């Protein structure tokens, strides 16, 4: 596992965006051989999306031959609801770059058969071989996507019941009213994520410090699903100083020395 210890959340956005651009450009995607990118929602990746849009407008990258898969979606929210993850992605990223709409893949939380929808999503991912790079965030309790504590580390795309802690955290997007936050969601599984060629997780803020500690210094544990990154052959965590507060000083020093060349220009 790589750890990229930065100072500010804005630097996390800049580093992660440049990493995505580098991977896309190195891959040199075509219509017949697209780059497959996994994407999250939430507050943490907003800086990354802003920087990606800047890099696109500066002609540093094209998303024309990029296929995307999102991590999750609430069940029961209208497609055009302001807090649906579909709305989030179009408003904060898709509408601002040259991605083709037919290359955008989003879970549908309003189908009559959720299990069928989850299998369709898994099959669609497999039709591309695998996801080349999956970017994600992490919850205060260490969950990735909506794989809440005690989720199977071999899990696939499925329905999940959201914990009260997650719903309280997400209520900030629903005028602070937890009653408006859906109780269920469709989410990729931990196993689905681990099938990706590369995983990049963004962690920012004091409230994520315990999750970062569990991911880096703890054991692989289904109570902290982010810890599954330890068994992935190519994973990277990009974090700000606030989220590093629970890490040992020598851990941060070790990774700063390892990644000195990769972070000096951020």
UniProtKB/Swiss-Prot annotation:
CDD domains: GlcN6P_deaminase (cd01399)
Record-level GO cellular component terms: cytoplasm
EC category name: hydrolase
GO molecular function, one term: glucosamine-6-phosphate deaminase activity
EC number(s) reported in the record: 3.5.99.6
Inhibition and activation profile: Allosterically activated by N-acetylglucosamine 6-phosphate (GlcNAc6P).
Reaction catalysis annotation: alpha-D-glucosamine 6-phosphate + H2O = beta-D-fructose 6-phosphate + NH4(+)
Designated name of the protein: Glucosamine-6-phosphate deaminase
Species annotation: Aliivibrio salmonicida (strain LFI1238) (Vibrio salmonicida (strain LFI1238))
